[in-house]
Amino acid sequence: MKHFFYSAFFLVTMLSISSCAMDEGMKPVNLSVDNVVSKFGDSIFLSSQVPCIDAKNGSVYITDYRAGVYALDSKLNLISKMSNIGRGFGEVNRPAKFFVDDNNVITLYNEGLQRYSYFEKDSFLMADNASVKENLAKSCRFFTRDGAIYQSVLGGKFLVSVIKNGNVTKQMCPTVDGVDFPSNVALSERHLLEGDNCFYVIGLGLPIVQAYSFDGRELARFNLVNIPLLESVYAKNENLKSSNSYYEVVRDAYYKNGFIYLLTSSFEGKYKCNTIIVLKKNADNIQYVSAYTLKNNLYSTFCINDQNECLAVCSKNSSIEVYKLPKVK
């Protein structure tokens, strides 16, 4: 069964893309940097360990493993530091992924404390006292809706748990036959993105993007192997001997104005993580739109702001790079 998904999809894929493998429209466009920011004010420098960035309602938010949680304005000037490392009010320990809702409330997963914390634009709100006992996919995007957290989980029959007050109230999105391997739990990690009237479930190591309704119905599915520049990347995961490891192809994911953006890796020669894939859901399917290559080789996270700019965190240079994206339809 391990090879069924890849073998079947590779056969179908080779037939379906053989005529377009050299299509110029499938090749990534090289982007130029418009701005670079590596420090805030006179004394706060960004570290190389930034797991998440988001832009919402004119502000930008970042988590830094070394320093905590920051709120910035649209020009990337510091508004406030919203957390403390160590004991005390607003404590965080290895702040990881987070989600900002329409009311500027930030739900942050405290990886070291194994619980969620909540922040407003410029202050700490409260910490969830209940540790989450689920086996969470800690490196994945999640979202909140109606007071509940939608989070990817590992090792069960379902890919998504809905969590309130530390308790699982609902499980959704069954594992996919022929795609998920019970012997490789790590491969079941998924990014979750809230869309318009649906949400997206995106594999980190498996080439699958799914759209679901909020009542758990699958609406559409896309196989990332259909994108020629990712075909050989996913082939490496098929050949892994370890039963609990994988190559992380989709490092980060983001949803903005009807488009799904994926930060993807490649392993040909020197490791790189600098290509943005753009997808769009139409009535009943998900389609490839375009791809962009960022200037440097290694990026940990990114987001898209209201000005259609990509804010990408460069791990090597410990900086936020700003790119103006071409308009897509």
Segments (PLM) and residue ranges:
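Loop/turn-rich, solvent-exposed surfaces of beta-rich toroidal or solenoidal domains
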Residues: 241-279
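Repeated scaffold domains used in trafficking and secretory/extracellular systems
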Residues: 47-52, 92-98, 135-145, 187-191, ...
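Conserved beta-strand positions in repeat-built beta-propeller and related beta-rich domains
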Residues: 62-66, 107-112, 151-156, 201-204, ...
